[in-house]
Curated annotation (Swiss-Prot):
The gene is ARX1. GO terms for biological process: proteolysis. It comes from the Eukaryota. This is Probable metalloprotease ARX1. Coiled coil: none annotated. Keywords: Cytoplasm, Hydrolase, Metal-binding, Metalloprotease, Nucleus, Protease. The lineage of its organism: Eukaryota, Fungi, Dikarya, Ascomycota, Saccharomycotina.
Length: 571
């Protein structure tokens, strides 16, 4: 369904409203302050429960709901009667180890998760992966790597943030008597944490260099910041630390109400960003194994415009743009050469494989391109409440009358009772495709030896919404287009020959202003880790990365980067 609007409205909505003037920057800055304050609030709760042990641990679903309530309370104090919309842009998610994203169960799903997964058993992995076990139990364990993701928006100007927290074993200090981490994190998880932190910092510095191209190091052999240069920098860092960029990672430009939350619904014609998919791993594998130097020459068709919906690296970063850096890396330690891909968790029980996890998506997103006359009164009431939430993902708990909860004395039972009638209405809404589920995904590894045994030139799997629905654009219909492996074949391999792999995530939002780069979110310190890997300084790309890091520390002649600080609050 395509919505026809005038050219004047298009100019206002997509151009004028995204100019980085002072009121717009202030909305981004305020959203960043609230997001970072909420992140500090949740991290402080986790530290008190598992490191300081000064309070009883709360289940994951309660931690998520408390953080969402904290964000809603903070938003209620800003821009009142000045903006039409403000709210949560991403429900708080706590994804542990191999769980990739979107783990934010509702308060009424805890008993269901235990019942649905009674027969599930843990699978072997390269390193201890307790993500599924910890998530089903609802509590974190020592050694878990928890990825916290949340976000908010003010008038459509969005700030999402992700940070990874490590649950350390603690020992009591002899002098102070406080509980301190026993030792640094080692192994593959430490490699991924170090690589992710360095990659995000390097890309941030690279985007800051777009303000003053004279400070772009000559080692990159580039005169401007392009998508291909960004991909090269991230891939170089990942390879140096023996890691792989997980499919779905992205560095993309965001606009008002367009922060990548509806990529399966909305087709963005003016898309700018770097996207990592399985096909990039396939191309890298073939480049290493096939002794060919031939290069495919793509001739430009004069009858085809540059207006495309397929993500490409052929773009240039310029001033006045806002970018979201969302990187997820998985370690390759102890793995044979293979493919890192995503396995979607669904809510269908009665599967033949007892190791399959059954979970219902907690986050849903309203598809405003579809309409339907609903029969149930409960469905119409739920749809009315969902329409008020806007285009961003939400939860049933967010539309309850008792939300937001009192952070000091939360009443989870009341909101649990309110959600029960919403379930009936949501069933009819989702059956008529008025909402889209934000599926929970798990990162898994499949050996190339098993993949090469299969081939099938059919199947549809794409990143882009239009290509996914219409089967357009050769190369994007298949996860592995050159090998001809279909999506169904890949799913069969995931059931028989896959291994769960831990993943680390970090997401920040930056704005390239006229004189400086404004770091809207993501200035938290990295975890205490020790990695056995380091980057090769003989490489030109690595040398350029180090020079950018030095320029970022030079406050006088270096890169001009300003950070948005969270609110000073005692938790």
């Amino acid at each position: 369904m395509a919505l026809q609007i005038s050219k004047e409205d298009t100019q206002v909505l997509l151009k004028d409203k995204n100019v980085l003037i002072e009121p717009t920057i202030e909305k981004y800055r305020t959203a960043g302050q609230i997001a970072q304050t909420a992140l500090n609030f949740l991290i402080s709760l986790i530290n008190k429960m598992y490191h300081e042990k000064s309070m009883e641990p709360l289940p994951i679903h309660q931690l998520c709901l408390l953080t969402d309530s904290f964000i809603a309370d903070c938003l209620s104090t800003k821009f009142n009667n000045k903006v039409n919309e403000k709210g949560i842009s991403m429900p708080t998610c706590i994804d542990i180890d191999e769980i990739n994203e979107n783990w934010c169960p509702e308060v009424d799903d805890i008993e269901n998760l235990s019942r649905w997964n009674q027969k599930s058993r843990s699978t072997k992995s390269i390193e201890l992966c307790n993500g599924v076990t910890s998530s089903l139990s609802g509590f974190l364990k020592v050694g878990d790597v928890a990825k916290i993701t949340l976000g908010c928006h003010i008038d459509g100007y969005t700030c999402n943030v992700s940070h990874t927290v490590v649950i350390y074993p603690t020992v009591q200090d002899a002098q102070s008597g406080k509980l301190l981490p026993e030792a640094a994190l080692l192994g593959g998880k430490a490699d991924a944490l170090a690589a992710t932190h360095i990659a995000v910092e390097s890309v941030t510095n690279l985007l800051a260099a777009a303000n003053d191209l004279t400070k772009l190091p000559a080692d990159f052999n580039a005169t401007k910041v392009t998508g291909s240069l960004i991909r090269t920098v991230v891939d170089t860092i990942a390879q140096s630390y023996n890691c792989c960029v997980v499919p779905g990672s992205r560095i993309r430009r965001i606009k008002r109400f367009l922060s990548g939350q509806n990529e399966n619904i909305i087709v963005e014609r003016d898309f700018k960003g770097v996207i990592w998919t399985e096909s990039h791993q396939e191309a890298a594998m073939l480049a290493r194994t096939v002794n060919e130097t031939a290069v495919d020459v793509k001739r430009k068709n004069p009858f085809i415009t540059e207006d495309t919906v397929v993500p490409t690296d052929d773009f240039t970063v310029v001033k006045g743009e806002v970018y979201m850096i969302d990187l997820k890396l998985a370690p390759l330690q102890g793995l044979e050469p293979g493919l890192i891909t995503l396995h979607t968790v669904d809510q269908f029980s009665g599967k033949s494989e007892s190791s399959d996890v059954v979970a219902r998506p907690g986050a849903i997103c309203r598809d405003f391109s579809k309409s339907h006359v609903l029969k149930l009164r409960a469905a119409r009431q739920v749809l009315t409440r969902l329409d008020k939430q806007g285009v961003y993902p939400t939860k049933l708990a967010h539309i309850a009358d008792s939300f937001p909860l009192d952070v000091q004395e939360p009443d989870f039972e009341t909101i649990k009772q309110e959600i029960k009638p919403f379930r009936l209405g949501l069933s009819e809404i989702s059956n008529n495709y008025l909402t889209i589920d934000r599926d929970v995904t798990i990162v898994k590894h499949v050996p190339w030896a098993k993949i090469l045994d299969l081939t099938n030139p059919s199947g549809v799997s794409s990143y882009d919404a239009m290509a996914k629905n219409k089967g357009l654009y050769p190369g994007f219909e298949l996860p592995l287009p050159k090998l001809g492996l279909s999506n169904l074949q890949l799913k069969s391999l995931l059931k028989k020959h896959s291994t769960p792999v831990p993943v680390v995530r970090q997401c920040v939002t930056v704005a390239i202003c006229d004189e400086e780069l404004l770091r809207i979110s993501g200035n938290l310190k990295s975890n205490w880790v020790h990695s056995v890997y380091s980057m090769d300084t003989a490489s030109n790309i690595v040398a350029g990365i180090f020079k950018l890091a030095q320029l970022s520390e030079d406050k006088r002649f270096g890169l001009k980067i300003r950070e948005t600080q969270p609110w000073k609050m005692k938790f």
